[in-house]
Amino acid sequence: MAKKPALSPQEFRSEALATALTTIERKHGQGAVMRLEDSAHVKIPAIPTGSIGLDLALGIGGIPKGRITEIYGPESSGKTTLALHIIAESQKLGGTAAFIDAEHALDVNYARRLGVNTPEMLISQPDFGEQALDIADLLVRSGAVDVVVIDSVAALIPQAELEGEMGETQVGGQARLMSHAMRKLTGTIHKSQTSVIFINQIRMKIGMTGYGSPETTTGGNALKFYASVRLDIRRIQTLKDKEETYGSRCRVKVVKNKVAPPFREALFDILYGTGVSREGELIDMGVEAGIVDKSGAWFAFGSERLGQGRDNVRAFLQEHTDIRDQIEGKLREHLGFAEYVPPPSPEVMEEEDGM
């Protein structure tokens, strides 16, 4: 009987690996471990943010699905507005969204004006932090929700602290709560391909001396580590018409990004009552890309003169949605974004509100 040829070290390693992979799949199911080239999830799906500039800065066209995103910044900087725009974009794509309002401060009428289909949005106003995170966990595990927003981490009060007396300290209670929640949620979020957004506030570090930022976010360090994307949103300018304030200029910095290069920035206007100004962004980015021509204070698109002054051009594009959609289509094509689907006209939205 012929002797079986001896295996080379490399062949022995390959055979041992194949045996291990077979055992793992038999024990934990197909797909428990795979080669990267066999994975169907190399391209990370995303939900648009409602801002073309921010979609570009994020590198994948929006916030990643199946990951945790943190949006933080000072008060009245546009954190909740940005989160509501993401919900609206998710709903336009046919998704289901949930808003966990731990602050008990959601303005439903404002959300509707931003384009959120409020009758279809799930909302919860929990009494304490454990309840809020348990609701988020159950929604994610269902696999039927596309985006879950928790507003905000600072309002996730541990039950022990809530039941204690006023002024009684619970050292590290919120940090422990968030650390446990992150460990429990991360794997489920990836499997269900749900985008979970935590809105957070900033605090000043006590006794900060020397170098480094004096600011920090609430809830400990767990969220910083587990979040795939962290967005720092700041109001950098107040928009005024003579003496009347009508909005603010905001800068969003991608301070952490595990799915694309980080530290990119986006600038856009947030107008009071209407949210992120799509038209203002189209003007700025259109001029930068050479799609909109700017000569002095005059703006033009091809042979069409749009007007004099940025505010007048923005008003013109709000009225002439066909021209606005043409500019956006060309801009998205220039940036290499997916096919543009125009949002419903204000008339259609008014009819739906009246139903």
Swiss-Prot record:
Keywords attached to this entry:
ATP-binding, Cytoplasm, DNA damage, DNA recombination, DNA repair, DNA-binding, Nucleotide-binding, SOS response
Q: What are the protein's GO molecular function terms?
A: ATP binding; ATP hydrolysis activity; ATP-dependent DNA damage sensor activity; damaged DNA binding; single-stranded DNA binding
Q: TM segments?
A: none
Any one GO CC term of this protein is:
cytosol
Q: Where does ATP bind?
A: G73, P74, E75, S76, S77, G78, K79, T80
Q: What PROSITE patterns does this protein's entry cite?
A: RECA_1 (PS00321), RECA_2 (PS50162), RECA_3 (PS50163)
Localization (cell):
Cytoplasm
General function of this protein? Can catalyze the hydrolysis of ATP in the presence of single-stranded DNA, the ATP-dependent uptake of single-stranded DNA by duplex DNA, and the ATP-dependent hybridization of homologous single-stranded DNAs. It interacts with LexA causing its activation and leading to its autocatalytic cleavage.
What is the name of this protein?
A: Protein RecA
From what organism does this protein derive?
Solidesulfovibrio magneticus (strain ATCC 700980 / DSM 13731 / RS-1)
Name the lineage. Answer: Bacteria, Pseudomonadati, Thermodesulfobacteriota, Desulfovibrionia, Desulfovibrionales
